[in-house]
């Protein structure tokens, strides 16, 4: 066992997570069509503060993330402060770590708490796949800059004459890695082939995710942590996530064609997480501050770890790399965990990480560790379903997972929970949570 790194303040306070909330998650271009991420962020933070009845001046910092950023609101965190009635003097800044963005936001607030610069803060994230920053070609962008500096009409017309029709076509946000040109689905296909993961295994995991998420909703387990969203023109509220296929069968999954490697692939739209809109946030405090305010925490942040690997081959192995570090820093093993929640970007990616967590060879030859991190107990794993079912608003997923895991730990009488995710750029994140 390596060095244990307790997450406590200088006064010995633990980092308490006192509350968490999210919007329902909606598939791209459905319920939240036309609602930008900044408005989703305002929606969830405003409701979170209203529900907890925490005075606005108590919150000293807000760290928020957005992966698909809009040029008109580059600092989403500050816009949320200004748009929710929070104290205008509240420090606010934005972060981005791809699919692990709200993990990073939580870590940043926790570090401020440990440093003693604040005693309470909010962390979270929001993304919209329905309101996108549609850009222009590089050639058109350059011409427009030059036109702005041109002094005469003839100079402007000469510049415009250089353009061709293709230069005027809109440019949507990139879906591929900047450094490799590979799409996330291409990497998932790599991983399926590398680790021998079949189409049937991927479809089975996706089906399990939807079935468990549907059951969680039907049993009322998510009602406290998901707000009702009222959306213009306010004819019908969104109460639940609208991506969950509770009535699907395995035969339905088998009908879909591969989405990336059309000829030999196994990754489909059904065994991948969909493009999604939504927001999520959590309130963190020092343990003593929560007691002063009479608040009973959902739980505590025990440890966290971030990792990075190469992006050319199987780059979505973040959980396999970050989990052993987070467990080590928490002074725990896989066997000590009550729950394990892993982000399901793709079924192939999820199954590959599960395989490697239990691999002695991977631990020895790749991580340089004496023993495997540990086998994943299916009865503890994604017990309420995962991102394939709920959807994945990139910057919101981590806060969803943290809140969901803490609520479930409390229902089970407490214990330790692991939340972990892969992210674009070969990044990984893992956090160990504790509930009493």
UniProtKB/Swiss-Prot annotation:
One of the record's GO molecular function terms: acetyl-CoA C-acyltransferase activity
Subunit structure: Heterotetramer of two alpha chains (FadJ) and two beta chains (FadI).
Functional pathway: Lipid metabolism; fatty acid beta-oxidation
A biological-process GO annotation: fatty acid beta-oxidation
Functional note: Catalyzes the final step of fatty acid oxidation in which acetyl-CoA is released and the CoA ester of a fatty acid two carbons shorter is formed.
InterPro entries reported for this sequence: Ac-CoA_C-AcTrfase_FadI (IPR012806), Thiolase (IPR002155), Thiolase-like (IPR016039), Thiolase_acyl_enz_int_AS (IPR020615), Thiolase_AS (IPR020610), Thiolase_C (IPR020617), Thiolase_CS (IPR020613), Thiolase_N (IPR020616)
Subcellular location: Cytoplasm
Residues forming the catalytic site: 99, 392, 422
Enzyme category, top tier: transferase
Enzyme Commission number(s) of this protein: 2.3.1.16
Protein name: 3-ketoacyl-CoA thiolase
Catalytic activity: an acyl-CoA + acetyl-CoA = a 3-oxoacyl-CoA + CoA
GO CC annotations on file: cytosol
Family from the record: Belongs to the thiolase-like superfamily. Thiolase family.
Keywords, in A-Z order: Acyltransferase, Cytoplasm, Fatty acid metabolism, Lipid degradation, Lipid metabolism, Transferase
């Amino acid at each position: 066992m390596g060095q244990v790194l307790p997450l406590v303040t200088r006064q010995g306070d633990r980092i308490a997570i006192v509350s968490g909330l999210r919007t329902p998650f909606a598939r791209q271009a459905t319920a939240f069509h036309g609602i930008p991420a900044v408005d989703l962020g305002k929606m969830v933070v405003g409701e979170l503060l209203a529900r907890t009845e925490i005075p606005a001046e108590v919150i000293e910092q807000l760290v928020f993330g957005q992966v698909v950023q809009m040029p008109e609101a580059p600092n989403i965190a500050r816009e949320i402060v200004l748009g929710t009635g929070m104290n205008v003097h509240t420090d606010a800044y934005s972060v981005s770590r791809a699919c692990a963005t709200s993990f990073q936001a939580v870590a940043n607030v926790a570090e401020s708490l440990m440093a003693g610069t604040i005693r309470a803060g909010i962390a979270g994230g929001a993304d919209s796949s329905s309101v996108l920053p549609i850009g222009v070609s590089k050639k058109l962008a350059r011409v427009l800059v030059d036109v702005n500096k041109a002094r005469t009409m003839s100079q402007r017309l000469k510049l415009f004459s250089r353009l061709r029709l293709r230069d005027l076509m809109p440019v949507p946000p990139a879906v591929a890695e900047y450094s490799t040109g590979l799409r996330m689905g291409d990497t998932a296909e790599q991983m399926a082939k590398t680790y021998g993961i079949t189409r049937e295994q991927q479809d089975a995991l996706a089906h399990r995710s939807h079935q468990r998420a549907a059951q969680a909703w039907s049993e009322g387990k998510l009602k406290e942590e998901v707000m009702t969203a009222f959306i213009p023109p306010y004819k019908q509220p969104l109460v639940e996530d609208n991506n969950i296929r509770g009535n699907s069968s395995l035969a339905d999954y088998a009908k879909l064609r591969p989405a990336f490697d059309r000829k030999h692939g196994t990754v489909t739209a059904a065994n991948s997480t969909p493009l999604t809109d939504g927001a999520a946030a959590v309130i963190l405090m020092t343990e003593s501050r929560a007691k002063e305010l009479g608040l009973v925490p959902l739980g505590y942040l025990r440890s966290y770890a971030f990792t990075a690997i190469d992006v050319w081959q199987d780059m979505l192995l973040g959980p396999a790399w970050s989990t052993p570090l987070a467990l080590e820093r928490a002074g725990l093993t896989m066997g000590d965990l009550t729950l394990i929640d892993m982000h399901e970007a793709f079924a192939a990616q999820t199954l590959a990480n599960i395989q490697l967590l239990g691999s002695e060879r991977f631990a020895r030859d790749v991580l340089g560790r004496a023993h495997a991190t540990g086998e994943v107990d299916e009865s503890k794993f994604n017990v309420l379903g995962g991102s394939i079912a709920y959807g994945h608003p990139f910057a919101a997923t981590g806060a969803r997972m943290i809140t969901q895991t803490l609520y479930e730990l409390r229902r089970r009488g407490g214990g330790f929970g692991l939340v972990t995710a892969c992210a674009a750029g070969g990044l990984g994140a893992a956090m160990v949570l504790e509930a009493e």
